[in-house]
């Protein structure tokens, strides 16, 4: 998920050079070749420059079994924030319920791929109609993306006239799957810089194996401190 946002910015910037900074409620869905929903990921999304914030409620993901969702909620691991800082070449996974986070580097391979996408990808766009999406009058555009040594990809964008042509709905169509991204309650404004920083009092964990023991210990300490 963390790597989707920078690619989204590169793709949109090639189509809309003046892509605005904004915040919105986002929905990402993946369907298989038969049209069956395989993954749903609702999130609060914010874009500031080349940096991104995605707030995810894990209990709102239907693909996660109910008993697992309950366990995550009990341990306060149900709220996850992804902060992608391209300028620092870092991704932060922040668990606000336990005041802890993980930090990962953005690989040079990934950053090189972003650079290639921004320079070598050829996009052809064709207006195929108009449509109103969530109350916004949109131009519907078919996009064909070609890149050396890679198969051609196609997608459809709905660009909102009253939101500086921001695509508020995107469908990327592949051979055996379809990705759909939608933005609602869009606010065209520069998000606060503090949203892209990890709170100073949060504990940095060494690796992902530390999350569950740390959350369990926090829960045990909270239970011990509770009035009897």
State where each predicted segment sits.
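A generic structural motif
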Residues: 27-33, 57, 94-96, 144-146, ...
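Short acidic, Pro/Gly- and aromatic-enriched capping/linker segments at domain boundaries
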Residues: 114-132, 187-197
């Amino acid at each position: 998920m963390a790597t989707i946002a920078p690619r989204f910015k590169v793709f949109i910037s090639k189509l809309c050079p003046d892509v605005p900074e904004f915040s919105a409620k986002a929905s990402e869905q993946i369907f298989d070749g038969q049209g069956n929903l395989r993954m749903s990921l609702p999130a609060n999304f914010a874009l500031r420059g080349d940096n991104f914030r995605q707030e995810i409620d894990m209990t709102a993901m239907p693909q996660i079994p109910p008993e697992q969702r309950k366990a995550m909620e009990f341990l306060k691991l149900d709220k996850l924030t992804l902060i992608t800082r391209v300028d620092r070449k870092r991704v932060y996974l922040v668990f606000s319920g336990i005041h802890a986070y993980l930090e990962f580097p953005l690989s040079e391979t990934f950053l090189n791929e972003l650079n290639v996408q921004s320079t070598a990808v050829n996009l052809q766009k064709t207006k195929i109609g108009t449509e109103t999406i969530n109350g916004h009058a949109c131009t519907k555009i078919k996009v064909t993306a070609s890149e050396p040594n890679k198969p051609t990809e196609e997608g459809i964008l709905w660009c909102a006239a009253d939101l500086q042509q921001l695509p508020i709905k995107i469908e990327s169509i592949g051979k055996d799957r379809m990705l759909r991204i939608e933005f609602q309650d869009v606010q065209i404004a520069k998000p606060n810089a503090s949203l892209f920083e990890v709170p100073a009092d949060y504990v940095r964990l060494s690796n992902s194996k530390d999350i569950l023991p740390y959350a369990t210990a926090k829960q045990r300490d909270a239970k011990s401190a509770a009035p009897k």
